[in-house]
């Protein structure tokens, strides 16, 4: 996959943020995300032109079955009528977006994530002494290279690769500042399985946004992901298509002093 990021001003391009986080641990799958279409903004632009008049289809390539997506005004996203087809570990998926006579496509797989085994408050601090520690743990998948994205809310993210704990239990801490959480707050921590291409892409986005990049953020950059224009290749789109298995844990912040 070609991944390029530049902060230079450029001709507006279609931005395809096709991000599907599927929470599979409950009684039935639950989707966060969808397809958001817009035009790219230059560095100092505040307004992001949205696109609603496109045709969007996802194909389950093993079966060849097509699933159209429909625009939701309330969500600002193109969404499928069902998400059951998105959780096949053995199939590739193709998304096709048609807009203004141009056809854009991208492919991905459903990437699994280990469940969050532990999410509890600790009593360690960092620099100021008033940080709140959250201790997390999961069991890495054996015999494969894995990449994960942890979402701590408030546009706080941590990409993780399993290079140094392949197939092992991994325990780590995240520290919230006193400006980010307070006693009594309910926090939600989410884990997503991602591909190596998206892991690299997301790290580039973080480097351009002072660590505050995130899904559907209006990025002041030309961020080329895994989508291509098959009608006019030089008029390539920006953005990324991925489908991730996701898990989450919630906990209330307590006063441990």
Q: What do the predicted segments below correspond to?
A:
Residues 1-257:
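A sequence/structural signal for flexible, mid-protein segments enriched
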């Amino acid at each position: 996959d070609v991944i390029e990021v530049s902060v230079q001003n450029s001709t507006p391009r279609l931005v395809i943020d096709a991000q599907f986080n599927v929470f599979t641990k409950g009684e039935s799958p639950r989707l966060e995300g969808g397809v958001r279409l817009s035009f790219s903004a230059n560095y100092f632009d505040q307004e992001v032109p949205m696109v609603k008049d496109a045709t969007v289809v996802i194909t389950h390539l093993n079966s060849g079955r097509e699933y159209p997506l429909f625009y939701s005004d309330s969500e600002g996203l193109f969404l499928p009528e069902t998400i059951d087809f998105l959780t096949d570990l053995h199939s590739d998926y193709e998304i096709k977006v048609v807009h203004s006579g141009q056809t854009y496509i991208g492919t991905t797989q459903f990437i699994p994530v280990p469940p969050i085994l532990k999410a509890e408050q600790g009593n360690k601090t960092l620099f100021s002494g008033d940080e709140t520690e959250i201790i997390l743990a999961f069991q890495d998948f054996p015999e494969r290279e894995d990449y994960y994205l942890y979402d701590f809310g408030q546009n706080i993210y941590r990409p993780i690769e399993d290079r140094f704990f392949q197939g092992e239990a991994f325990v780590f801490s995240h520290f919230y500042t006193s400006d980010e959480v307070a006693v009594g707050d309910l926090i939600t921590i989410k884990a997503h399985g991602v591909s190596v291409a998206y892991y690299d892409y997301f790290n580039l986005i973080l480097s351009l946004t002072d660590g505050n990049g995130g899904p559907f953020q209006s990025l002041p950059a030309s961020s080329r992901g895994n989508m291509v224009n098959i009608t006019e290749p030089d008029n390539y789109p920006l953005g990324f298509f991925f489908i991730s298995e996701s898990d989450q844990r919630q906990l209330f912040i307590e006063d441990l002093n």
